[in-house]
Amino acid sequence: MQTATKPLVGARAVPLSRRASFLVAEARRKPSTNARRTRVGSTSTTTTTTTILTDVNGPALTTVAKPGHQYDLKQTVEMKATVSVHMKSFWWSDEKKERARDWAYDLILGSWLTLELVSSELDPKTGQEHDVISGKLKHSRETEKDYDLYEAIFTCRHRLAPSGAVRLVNYHHTEMLLGEVKIFPAGEDPTKSSAVTLFHCQSWIDPSHCSPDKRTFFPVEKSYIPSQTPKGVEKLRKSELEALRGNGCGERKKHDRIYDYDVYNDLGKPESKRPVLGGKEHPYPRRCRTGRPRSKTDPSSEEESHKKGEMYVPRDETFTERKEQAFLTKQLLSQLHGLCTGLKVNKDILPSFPTLASIDALYDDDFRNQPVQPEGGKVRLILDLLAKELVHLVKLEGAEFVEGIRRVFKFETPEIHDMDKLAWFRDEEFARQTLAGMNPLSIQLVTELPIVSKLDELKYGPADSLITKELIEKQINRIMTAEEAVAQKKLFMLDYHDLLLPYVHRVRKLDNKTMYGSRTLFFLADDGTLRPIAIELTRPKSPHKQQWRKVFTPGSGYSGSVTGSWEWQLAKIHVLSHDTGYHQLVSHWLRTHCCVEPYVIAANRQLSQMHPIYRLLHPHFRFTMEINAQARGMLICADGIIEKTFSPGEFSMEISSAAYDKQWRFDMEALPEDLIRRGMAVRGEDGKLELAIEDYPYANDGLLVWDAIKQWASDYVAHYYPCAVDIVDDEELQDWWTEVRTKGHPDKQDEPWWPELDCHESLVQVLATIMWVTSAHHAAVNFGQYPMAGYVPNHPSIARRNMPCEMGPEEMLAFKAAPEKVWLDTLPSQLQTVMVMATLDLLSSHASDEEYMGTHQEPAWQRDGEVDKAFQVFQKKMRDIAEQVEEWNKDDSRRNRHGAGVVPYVLLRPLNGNPMDAKTVMEMGIPNSISI
């Protein structure tokens, strides 16, 4: 007698022919008809034929018959389907009538959701696909978390092979979120049965009157490269991809799920035109095509969306209805966008803070930086109060404005200010944050002297820097020569000179904004910490003025005078505003959000949902397109928050394009290659990286995470691609990577550095790079924004006044008479500060349903024993990394991450426990995707 057995957790999936023991103890019978009906796995002495229905992706239908018995093609079996459905939620009371309409619809129509079972194999008689088995689902009166359960019973003939796909049609009047579909023998408990076929969908299904096409889903039991696709679903695999590509025509509707490409021609407005990003003049990655009509006032650009902040993204890329925090965030960003409009109309509402104490007054010392606020908490409070107070606030001035802001915004004290109220002032902290702050991706090694610009001298002025060998030696107290400092890797630099200099005169024409090209030089002390030794600010020559430039040093100007110390603090404001702008526009937006969107689009257009690489990358793409669309609508658009509160102003996105053109290379986006490019690491003879600064928290933690990601990707790839020819012959994989290059990044498609997917090593490097950028890279530059830049003197986003010494004797006299006033006038205005704080606070938050690296496991990974085992190894490595980071943060010798008043570096510490137990948002772990 055969008995049902349950596979061991982590056991590798076995071929169908070896799975005869996966039997069902009981099955449901129907009254007999001319066709004999048999329990699946029956152990009756009179019926010994067993039909296996559990391996839905087997290469062929297999039957096991004991000797002396024949297989009866007329046998049938009853299978049950359960479907979890989440109907669209309703937020406001005036929409409750929609819920009543739903109930009435269910009562009248009864069954509005149909399900079809599709065989994984062809009919051996016809050589064509089997006829599908269709049925209507009915409400089971059961619920599962936020989902209602629907079910149906299907009678299947034995000759129908296991389900290779399911197809659904929604005849309801509204869309629904499809959770999971389970197919299993009737009479079995799906939570205990080993014969369950699972379809993990998590997809919005439109009403049939909006989209008559049937929605297709494939089971998670096994992933297939194209050549291994079961014959019965080969056509469905191809047709699903064709549906997602669309035809490139027409305006996209909200319910569409089409992925296509377009240039960034939607950032301008009729009254504020902006150049198109993407093309020869302004190279840029591509974004998702919306198909909106061209603007009548600017034919090169799209019309604005009819609803402010509403931009098309494929339906399954949008936030789930259950993400109330995301919903409120979107509304608040819209309100902040309204503040930007107020700035444009009311140019006189740009008062400076009257004192440093007035800046500190914005924070509530009793309100600590808690990771999550209940039921929207702070965000809902801000939204409600903004709606009532916005008009009143913009009319206030001076102290009244500050007090009004305090009433509306209950800002927590950022960690940098909470740990040490004077941290922002210290030069040591200024230098430390280049290694462990919110932008640790810009610091680079100085490899030669003199420091020379690559810009045209005739256009911009002399190329040689004023930071000379003599100045360097003086600043390091002549303990070594400048040449020795270079040879011993003691000199490091923040270099924003060549990137910003071409925009200086254009930015200076804007109201209340200024800019320089800047270089900041640091010296590496014997204790492993950096200290700044010089800042060079440059204004390029113009038709009316000669080049102006000057070097500022800490405590050295005017022979160590007080005036020189104040000038040093002003110079730091300018450098920090450059660093903040570069961080937001390049390190953050360009290198993560913007450059990743083409990977997402190409993956959905070219990789089937049953493709193993799609299933590996899918969790790393979660919500990225929706966040990017919101950014285009409210953050990076004309007169948006970035333009109004960051130094480059309306030229912000042009600078981002220039950085993409001159700096971005896919092969340099992997952490090791990025460190090597900046001179921050070299590869030793043993292949291991040696850091130029041993205590470099971002690199120390990041390399551990990178190695874990790469090993996980390597194990995964090895499981599905035993040899290189499998990679080369995978048409979907090759088409995906070709499309990333030719359609997603077409302005760089002919660059020689694009890797070829021709072996295990190259594929792993490509996948690990994408996984790194979407997870750890983004976490490092995103979740430290408010903790570090939420206190404006520590990392101002804008500098509003030129250096007094540039402007002449009168400005210098005014500066000497009131240096603190000039310093405060150089910082962002009160309103700009509040806008930046509110925006960074939101962007730095974690979603309530965040999926964290090393903790979230896709259902498809769990179903494959080898993949599950590899993930467990990855998971353990991430836990080990978390423990290592904790040890380093307690190590007195690591002064860049531990010490009195020093904020520990935890941005790349993997989640180890419950994220809700974290003390700060920075400690909550590394999300899989570019998400907020």
Swiss-Prot record:
Cofactor binding notes: Binds 1 Fe cation per subunit. Iron is tightly bound.
Bias-annotated ranges (Basic residues): 285-294
**In what residue span(s) does the PLAT domain sit?**
79-219
Q: What class of enzyme is it?
A: oxidoreductase
What's an example GO BP annotation here? Answer: oxylipin biosynthetic process
Q: Where is this region: Disordered?
A: 270-311
The UniProt entry, under Pfam families, shows: Lipoxygenase (PF00305), PLAT (PF01477)
Pathway, per record: Lipid metabolism; oxylipin biosynthesis
UniProt feature, compositional bias: Basic and acidic residues = 270-284, 295-311
Q: Gene3D superfamilies, from UniProt?
A: 3.10.450.60, Lipoxygenase-1, Domain 2, Lipoxygenase-1, Domain 3, Lipoxygenase-1, Domain 5, PLAT/LH2 domain
Question: Which EC number applies?
Answer: 1.13.11.12
Give start and end of each Lipoxygenase domain: 223-932
UniProt name for this protein:
Lipoxygenase 2.2, chloroplastic
Its gene name is: LOX2.2
